[in-house]
A protein has these predicted regions:
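Conserved alpha/beta-domain cores
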Residues: 1-203, 209-211, 225
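Short linear motifs centered on Gly/Pro in flexible linkers and helix caps
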Residues: 3, 238-240
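Intrinsic disorder/low-structure terminal segments
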Residues: 77, 222, 246-247
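Positively charged, low-complexity, intrinsically disordered RNA-binding extensions
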Residues: 204, 219
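Divalent-metal-activated hydrolytic enzyme cores
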Residues: 214-215, 221
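A short, polar/charged loop-to-alpha-helix boundary motif
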Residues: 223-229
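Active-site loop ensemble at the mouth of alpha/beta enzyme cores that anchors a bound cofactor
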Residues: 229-238
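A cross-taxon signal for low-complexity, glycine/charged-rich
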Residues: 240-255
């Protein structure tokens, strides 16, 4: 069984060491638990350790785990690709959407939120590695799109999100994070308060923190390996097999 408590302690130590190296304070970094395929019971174990921000990639998982997690105050971020036909469900269960990457999606979110008379925190997802396999707006379009999104009063732009290049060459991964930081600076200069940078995962969080990340998204290093490669879960057009993600005993081995 995965030692979630110990793994969280290890991640906190990695954050602390990275902050010391970068001349930053550990309190500047938020830890988001990437909980795709992780059972509600395992998430509750992490909650007991004081980590209460989770990120889900699939709308179905948001719904399946919602009731089981409700007794504990927490934030749920949607970090997967969002199809427009899933907007109604996502805004019902999520507190923030980190994957807003196109004008059509932003405008449809705006209309739905107007209908429900509410607002939603969002991050803009930027494809800083220019990989065709990834979602996210291209860096060249980010500032222009952000300015358009900022006119939609139901959307509160809180930050930027990216997935670093899948590479063992740290210098190439670093360039992705540096690019997102530059885009943030441009947007701040333009008066858009994008204070959060969601970048860095289990394998590259140190580099992300050195380059200014304020939120890292960690799943594997806390909950253990998943039954499918990470690339699978970033494709919202594919539905996963029934992994029974509720609080039943069969689901507990997935973390």
């Amino acid at each position: 069984m995965t030692d979630i408590k110990n793994n969280i302690a290890i991640i906190r130590n990695r954050i602390k060491a990275s902050c010391i190296k970068a001349g930053r304070q550990p309190g500047e970094i938020k830890l988001l638990l990437a909980t795709k395929t992780i059972s509600a019971n395992d998430i509750l174990v992490a909650f007991k350790e004081g980590e209460t921000i989770i990120g889900e990639n699939k709308v179905q998982e948001l719904k399946e785990k919602f009731d089981a997690l409700q007794p504990v105050a927490h934030q749920t971020h949607f970090i997967g690709h969002l199809q427009t036909n899933k907007i109604k469900e996502v805004i019902k269960y999520a507190d923030c959407i980190q994957s807003v990457d196109r004008l059509e999606l932003a405008e449809k979110l705006q209309r739905r939120l107007e209908f429900e008379d509410r607002t939603m925190d969002i991050f803009l997802q930027v494809n800083t590695s220019y990989e065709e396999s990834k979602f996210g707006m291209l860096p060249d379009h980010a500032v222009k799109l952000a300015l358009q999104f900022s006119k939609l009063d139901r959307l509160h732009i809180k930050g930027l999100m990216t997935i670093g290049l899948f590479s063992a060459e740290i210098s190439k991964v670093r360039k992705c994070f540096q690019l997102l930081k530059r885009i943030q600076t441009e947007l701040l200069d333009a008066g858009i308060p994008v204070t959060e940078l969601s970048m860095g995962m289990s394998n590259d969080l140190e580099t992300a923190i050195e380059e200014g990340s304020t939120m890292i998204r960690v799943g594997t290093a806390i909950f253990g390996k998943r039954p499918f490669p990470d690339s699978y879960y970033w494709n919202e057009t594919k539905e996963p097999p029934d992994l029974n993600l509720g609080s039943s005993p069969a689901a507990q081995g997935l973390g």
